[in-house]
Amino acid sequence: MKLLVVDDSSTMRRIIKNTLSRLGYEDVLEAEHGVEAWEKLDANADTKVLITDWNMPEMNGLDLVKKVRSDSRFKEIPIIMITTEGGKAEVITALKAGVNNYIVKPFTPQVLKEKLEVVLGTND
């Protein structure tokens, strides 16, 4: 299963990718910002989950989510936002834009596992 991780921090991308690897997800694409993410998603339409940060240069995560949701190929792709923006207003804004689940940094691997299970419908 192909996943796309988007974060301007290479450290955060590595942490997320390592966590996903421990969970059995090996086919993980990476992007540094929304523009690069859109290019990778466009070239890899079989991507099953998008995990994105909010605050990034060039195109932020919220704008990326809106762009993804406006494309008929990706209307149903599960999107998890992982960000430091943890206020109630930010969560509501992200959910209204089309995010399926939301994680506030810092987070534990267990939280990412559970959020992935929820968006993929594999939770017990």
Curated annotation (Swiss-Prot):
Cell compartments where the protein resides: Cytoplasm
Protein name, entry field: Chemotaxis protein CheY1
Q: What gene is this protein translated from?
A: cheY1
Record-listed 4-aspartylphosphate modification sites: 53
Spell out the PANTHER family in the cross-references: RESPONSE REGULATORY DOMAIN-CONTAINING PROTEIN, STRESS RESPONSE REGULATOR PROTEIN 1
Q: What does this protein do?
A: Chemotactic response regulator protein that modulates the rotation direction of bacterial flagellar motors. Plays an important role in the colonization and infection of Helicobacter pylori. Upon phosphorylation by CheA, interacts with the flagellar motor protein FliM to cause clockwise flagellar rotation and bacterial reversals, as opposed to straight swimming when CheY1 is not phosphorylated.
UniProt binding sites for Mg(2+): 7-8, 53, 55
Q: Which InterPro entries match?
A: Bact_response_regulator (IPR050595), CheY-like_superfamily (IPR011006), Sig_transdc_resp-reg_receiver (IPR001789)
